[in-house]
A protein has these predicted regions:
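Structural preference for beta-strand elements that scaffold enzyme active sites
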Residues: 17-21, 51-55, 88-92, 114-120, ...
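Short glycine-centered helix-capping/turn motifs at secondary-structure transition points
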Residues: 49, 111-112, 150
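Conserved mixed alpha/beta catalytic, RNA-binding, or beta-rich assembly cores of soluble enzyme
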Residues: 69-73, 80, 95-98, 102, ...
Length: 183
């Protein structure tokens, strides 16, 4: 479906400058230990031309629903980061808590991902931070602290979204702090 969708966008709207961003998730049943492994989550990134950006969820987290553990092992993230570099795909670092921000810094210091970095603050998921302006502020302050310590590069952009009733508070807080937003 990714290939057909991208092909239709490029064919029917040749002047459209929309960024093609494809997920690396989509199936919480897949992990390093599953029969297909995590490779199935990267097939489109490896094979479909025209993908410019791809999600990189910087750790495992709990969706708060039955069967809702979303596995992003260091093995998977290292392979994904290397694939993105090979294919010139810009990672969108989806971060659901502070630990994921720090993890991105570790992958950056190891050379698995390169600056500039783009963070997507994903707030309101049960297993992550709440979707409040205070949590946006805390995450932005943590990014700045890691930058000051040399554990994140200076070249960083940030966007944010909140789930459900947190959508507008996160959106307005992100905008007020000079960030981008995702609808």
């Amino acid at each position: 479906k990714f290939y057909e969708t991208i092909k239709l966008i490029r064919k029917n709207y040749p002047d459209c400058d929309v960024i093609i961003n494809c997920t690396s998730s989509g199936d919480n049943r897949v992990s390093d230990d599953s029969p297909y492994g995590n490779a199935v989550r990267m097939l489109h990134h490896a094979n479909v031309p025209g993908i410019e950006m791809g999600t990189f969820d910087a750790g495992t987290f709990n969706w708060g629903i039955p069967g809702g553990i979303f596995s992003n092992s260091p093995t998977f993230l290292t392979t994904l980061g290397n694939l993105y570099q090979e294919r010139n795909i810009k990672p969108e670092f989806e971060v659901f808590d502070m630990g994921m921000i720090r993890a991105v810094g570790v992958y950056w210091k190891k050379g698995i991902v390169k600056a500039p970095l783009h963070f997507q603050l994903c707030l309101g998921v049960v297993g992550g931070l709440a979707a409040t302006p205070a949590d946006v502020q805390d995450m932005l302050a943590y990014i700045q602290r890691l930058q000051a310590e040399g554990n994140l590069p200076k070249e960083v952009t940030v966007s944010g979204f909140g789930i459900g009733k947190g959508h507008l508070p996160v959106m307005f807080s992100a905008l007020a702090n000079g960030c981008h937003i995702r609808k």
